[in-house]
């Protein structure tokens, strides 16, 4: 690997406009850090690209040498795919330009943008791009994997709102992908992750929105069953303007909480209404009436405030692990299992996230994008979070154990952005009937699997055994 790194460095240094960072460089340590602290890896070389030509140069050199290559946009990969040990990281974090056409309600943004970059630019025109819920997330990884957030029920997945991509493929060429130009790649990039190349620009549709109604409240342990049963049945007929997420977690020990809640299991309810304020008030009041909530807040906030309110809950450097799946229906047996699980949470930062999709995201035809099955409305994410490596085993074992217990009730399928790095066997499950088409596109555009640090769709000639050894 050191010889490969030296070969890559020597090849790039005369024609690369950005920064080439190696161990010992003053900014290397900061540059190699990613969001998930479980993956404190040490790349042999970080190529921080300034423009598309830099990306092309890095990709061509990586392809020619065969060096292990990761692509970093926001460095927010839950599975740690934004980095690697000893190899090359193609870093797009300096490429964050956003251009908004307010009249056409369109935007173009570069591959290194964070959600915050896009939100601030589009809000100046009173517009939004439907994305995730943590503003320091990289937009590329989110969008390419699908992209869910507060606006999913109203406007669809992030990938549903993309009209075009500019892609650097494994041979270093630049291609445009639109419905009528490279349509197979356009299809695959909407949900297929980073398998097909490095996206340097996205062309997206925007929607008018500047403020939302946000209601939040904590339901105590005795009320959790009733809340889940009501939520399960209520959301199936709820307007698309309403997004109601529930987190089952342990309440903090802060003085602003009643004594009976501190450190105890709670259902944390967050309801976001994106339509007319008065209509939203009625729906939110109906929902809250069944929650018997404590510490209630119900207010109109700016969209930018909505997009940053969870940032501090998911800081850089903590350790994260998740297991996720879909349900057609949350039957009472599943609810019983969730109630047992919340009592046994390994730490206060670990939670069971529940969301109801449906709405606009379910109205896209099944084969229109590479994104997995949209027919199951309930999505669950078992997200373990902790600060120190000595607690890895207890948190990872908790997530795996609960997932295995719930798995028989789940519908086959998984959202790739919620997958951890040890779930390569579930990737075909994520894409289901789209798998063969995905493999065909991958085989054509990346036959040697240069872009393999992702939830990988191997080309037709790449064996799963080889793939796993290369990712380890």
Cite the ranges covered by each PLM segment.
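Soluble FAD-dependent oxygen oxidases
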Residues: 1-472
